[in-house]
Amino acid sequence: MSIQLQKTMQRHRGLFTTDHRTIGIRYLLLSLLAVAIGTVLSLFMRIHIVSPDLKLPLFGQIPPEGYLALVTMHGTLMVFFVLTTAPVNGFASLILPSQIGAQRMALPLLNAVSFWLTSLSLTVLLAAFFVPGGAPISGWTNYPPLSAIAVAGPGQATGMDLWLVSIGIFCFASILSAINMLTTIVSKRCEGMTLLRMPLTVWSWLVTGVLILFAFSILFAAVVLLLSDRHLATGFFVPTGEVINGLLLDRANSHANGSPMLWLHLFWFFGHPEVYIAVLPSMGLTSSLLANFTRRPVFGYRFMVATTLFIGVFGLLVWGHHMFVSGMNPYAGTAFSLMTMAIAIPSSGKVLGWLAMLLRGRDSRVHPMPTPMLFTFGFLSFFIAGGLTGPILAQPILDAYLHNTYFVVAHFHLIMAMAGAFSLFAAVYYWFPLMTGRLMHETLGKWHFWLSLIGAYATFFPMHFAGLAGQPRHYAQLIGSTSTFLSSLLPLQTGITHSALFLASAQLLFLANLAWSARRGKPAGSNPWRATTLEWASDLTQCRVVRGPYEYNFQSNLSDFVMQCAAEPEQE
């Protein structure tokens, strides 16, 4: 066999590898690409809002329909390919097997197939920018009938089809990934790793996997039905006699007796669990990192497990609070409101548990505070700030005014986008040694944290005031004869735009830190954070777990911690 052929075969083995760590890193790089594109799109949106006549380099002046296309693609990229792909597919592939003492995922080929399908999904989505008409303009929720009729506007023909195909592929890939994740947790735990010895990150991935099976199956079905309406003239979502751009849709046996409400129910049955699919892994990571850096056991481990399960169950039951103004039965609105208030109870319990860990560990926590701990504080801050507006939007009478305003944009960007992003940063800084064998630069990391924290609050907190003033989201501009009542908000929106540019610029520090640390970072050693969970164990080939995952403040003159697989405390 020639040397060239050997190199080619090695290259293909690497390309189509089933190694879980390699696939996990590839997922994270895919998410990094998606977040870079999504961030650029959001900056174009912000610039257009305050300067609609500005001609951007390479893009020219963005028309109103172009702004709506940016909204659609930004939301889709961030929700699906960043906040779902990175914490679930990426870090679960990278870390999950090691945390339960397994050598690999239960279904490694399925893991690889899921990654390549996700990559295909992203490619199909981005292709929508380059087809006639461009990307769809109906928002990342794509409500019918606007999304069901090709003549409804620019981007609603081929671009809309590509969006639906992309999301269908993504749903299928996510379901495969969830099956693999759940099978791994159930069948690959090492000796002694009982359910109540699993780290809380594993519990969060377990519940997240179940949510994915339910939520993405429903979204996949909804996508198929919408494609059927568009190309087979079925009538699932388009009412009889609908007029779109002057065209009466009254053809015989087509688009008869459909209802956009059906799409709302199907989409939001996926959409609200998606919030917890994005946030639950962050909750598990927060508990683990707080225990690690305060050098104290998790406060109420069983309670934390119970709240995770409670959130998973109730996360499937509260989708209707997105539909208070849709015309659904008011009694149903009351029921959804009560259940939404109820789901705040376990979330509040988690916050109280985290605060108790900080209080108990105030004398024993690591000094100086490492970067992963800072970003964990950031997650906690955004989760509380965004969560406080949740009960407001859960009231039908208040939501009637605030629905579809910037108040909602501020709410979900704080509790989902910023909380999720800061948790992802914490995870990267914490687990970077497992990927490269090196530590990330602490000074750059701290600058990255503080600039990002300031930029995030300066960007999203003022949006609450824009929403309270009545500004709807998705408006392409604030000036002109149609926007007279919004012109007074232009200074506020200008400040938000400047803050968004500042926040995006701060992320260059993170990219620089990644590039520098991967090559020249300080060697990490086998367990740089002196952690107790198995991903930091030096050998998992004959691993046997003999204790829980958070044995810190261990009463010994040798060490203040003991790993799950260690019979005695480790020598320092």
What are these regions, as identified by a protein language model?
Residues 2-572:
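Membrane-embedded and interfacial regions of multi-pass energy-transducing membrane proteins
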